């Protein structure tokens, strides 16, 4: 039985923090399920951390569906939320609904996430009215990175802070079940969290949010070239994997792997008969 939308809302009411992580493949989804993560986000961040793009803008519906299906197969308990990629919901409420429907019907997701506030409220309402749960996303919205002039903290002025509060209320009114608050002052995130009835999920938005989401690759230390300020590294998988691969390569090179322990053998009689046939 998967986590439900109602359960996430109850967690906010009971002041129980919600831990969410991204996943992009079958084995990671299995691990997160085993660890008790209540909701998994199949984020368009896969464009950067899996596919090697410079931003999330290049991610397609087909990219998302491919990875979404793997995560759904690997999980049994977590609520699966799928990110709607750039330009898959921007044109009209109907376009948004059709693509959200694909994530539910083809991909097996239980909810979708899209970026924006007041400007996408009509799309959120159209999707929700057809029975598909929607998670909102405001603050630093990576799909708008070109318009925002990079990955910068949002809501630092009075005008932009008030605009983000308006965005959050518009998403709540449109029927969103939760909102991601990304890269904004902690004080602003706390005000937004207290001002709406639905859960807020922070990423670089302080400790007062109702929950937190992190990119799995960041918190496990898969990359060494860039560490987001909002990330705490709980492991150094880059170092662990590099060491393991180096040891493997060295053992193969010097003939130390494989050994008899990792090999299969013929019955002695069969081997003798085989040698007679070929030698």
Swiss-Prot record:
Q: What class of enzyme is it?
A: transferase
Q: Which gene encodes it?
A: panB
Matches recorded under PANTHER family: 3-METHYL-2-OXOBUTANOATE HYDROXYMETHYLTRANSFERASE (PTHR20881:SF0)
For binding Mg(2+), which residues are annotated in this chain's numbering?
44, 83, 115
Q: How is the cofactor bound?
A: Binds 1 Mg(2+) ion per subunit.
Q: Which InterPro entries match?
A: Pantoate_hydroxy_MeTrfase (IPR003700), Pyrv/PenolPyrv_kinase-like_dom (IPR015813), Pyrv_kinase-like_dom_sf (IPR040442)
Chief subcellular location: cytoplasm
Q: Which HAMAP family match?
A: PanB (MF_00156)
Task: State the Gene Ontology terms under molecular function.
Answer: 3-methyl-2-oxobutanoate hydroxymethyltransferase activity; magnesium ion binding
Enzyme Commission (EC) number:
2.1.2.11
Which residues of this protein are catalytic? 182
Q: Which family does the record assign?
A: Belongs to the PanB family.
Q: What does this protein do?
A: Catalyzes the reversible reaction in which hydroxymethyl group from 5,10-methylenetetrahydrofolate is transferred onto alpha-ketoisovalerate to form ketopantoate.
Specify the protein name.
3-methyl-2-oxobutanoate hydroxymethyltransferase
Of the GO CC terms on this record, one is: cytoplasm
Q: Which keywords has UniProt assigned to this entry?
A: Cytoplasm, Magnesium, Metal-binding, Pantothenate biosynthesis, Transferase
Catalysed reactions, as listed in the record: 3-methyl-2-oxobutanoate + (6R)-5,10-methylene-5,6,7,8-tetrahydrofolate + H2O = 2-dehydropantoate + (6S)-5,6,7,8-tetrahydrofolate
**Highest taxon above the source species:** Bacteria
Q: Which GO terms describe its biological process?
A: pantothenate biosynthetic process
Q: Which cofactor does it need?
A: Mg(2+)
How is the quaternary structure described? Homodecamer; pentamer of dimers.
- Record's subcellular location: Cytoplasm
List of residues binding 3-methyl-2-oxobutanoate = 44-45, 83, 113
